[in-house]
């Protein structure tokens, strides 16, 4: 999703921050592209099942984790994978009133769109995220030709921050660039999604981000 633009030194990471980074990275990957056979294998492996069980042991995440695990178990045919890929495309790749575009700028822009106006991509939020990436000596991978304010990029950047920045910086970034629009995105996904997987993924992402922001705040106080 994002990669080092230059070589960076290895940093020592505590186990809690490593787990947090892993969760953000997983969520990022699921918004970045459709689930294929390889991703499905990774998401249903024995190690993954242990991960889902641990995440689902938290009451606030359990319902959505259960839905995701159940939906993944249904992806046992090519047809089922194609149908989920069609859901992904309809939700996140096609910019219509029946989609839930995953770009921060579409939820943070305080200028009301006139009827018929196309949403502005590669705008202010994209430029801001590009600057954040540049400051951290990171860049969006070339095979992901999306604006930098795509949810997958932002989640991947938070995954990076978890292991490369202090708690104050993490908390500030999450509050200013993720938590402030994710609720509206989740509402849109819930409104237009005809399946269960991406609704549950969006809700889980929002629940996790809120919980993580609260944890960071408690650590700072």
UniProtKB/Swiss-Prot annotation:
<dbReference type="Pfam" id="PF02613">
    <property type="entry name" value="Nitrate_red_del"/>
</dbReference>
<dbReference type="GO" id="GO:0005737">
    <property type="term" value="C:cytoplasm"/>
</dbReference>
<dbReference type="InterPro" id="IPR020945">
    <property type="entry name" value="DMSO/NO3_reduct_chaperone"/>
</dbReference>
<keyword id="KW-0963">Cytoplasm</keyword>
<dbReference type="GO" id="GO:0051259">
    <property type="term" value="P:protein complex oligomerization"/>
</dbReference>
<comment type="function">
    <text>Involved in the biogenesis of TorA. Acts on TorA before the insertion of the molybdenum cofactor and, as a result, probably favors a conformation of the apoenzyme that is competent for acquiring the cofactor.</text>
</comment>
<protein>
    <recommendedName>
        <fullName>Chaperone protein TorD</fullName>
    </recommendedName>
</protein>
<dbReference type="InterPro" id="IPR036411">
    <property type="entry name" value="TorD-like_sf"/>
</dbReference>
<dbReference type="GO" id="GO:0006457">
    <property type="term" value="P:protein folding"/>
</dbReference>
<dbReference type="InterPro" id="IPR036386">
    <property type="entry name" value="HscB_C_sf"/>
</dbReference>
<dbReference type="InterPro" id="IPR050289">
    <property type="entry name" value="TorD/DmsD_chaperones"/>
</dbReference>
<keyword id="KW-0143">Chaperone</keyword>
<dbReference type="InterPro" id="IPR023069">
    <property type="entry name" value="Chaperone_TorD"/>
</dbReference>
<comment type="similarity">
    <text>Belongs to the TorD/DmsD family. TorD subfamily.</text>
</comment>
């Amino acid at each position: 999703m994002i990669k080092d633009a230059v070589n960076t030194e290895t940093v020592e990471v505590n186990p809690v921050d490593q787990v947090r980074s892993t969760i953000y990275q997983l969520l990022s990957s699921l918004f970045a592209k459709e689930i294929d056979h390889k991703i499905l294998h990774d998401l249903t492996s024995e190690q993954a099942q242990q991960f889902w069980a641990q995440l689902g042991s938290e009451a606030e995440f359990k319902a959505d984790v259960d839905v995701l695990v159940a939906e993944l178990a249904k992806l046992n045919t090519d047809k089922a994978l194609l149908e989920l890929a069609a859901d992904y495309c309809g939700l996140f790749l096609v910019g219509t009133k029946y989609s839930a575009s995953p770009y921060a700028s579409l939820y943070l822009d305080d200028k009301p769109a006139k009827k018929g106006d196309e949403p502005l991509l590669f705008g202010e939020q994209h430029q801001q995220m590009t600057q954040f990436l540049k400051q951290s000596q990171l860049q969006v991978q070339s095979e992901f030709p999306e604006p930098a304010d795509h949810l997958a990029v932002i989640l991947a950047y938070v995954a990076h921050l978890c292991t490369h920045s202090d708690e104050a910086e993490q908390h500030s970034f999450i509050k200013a660039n993720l938590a402030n629009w994710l609720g509206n995105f989740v509402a849109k996904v819930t409104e237009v999604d005809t399946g269960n997987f991406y609704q549950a993924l969006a809700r889980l992402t929002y629940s996790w981000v809120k919980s993580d922001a609260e944890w960071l705040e408690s650590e700072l106080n």
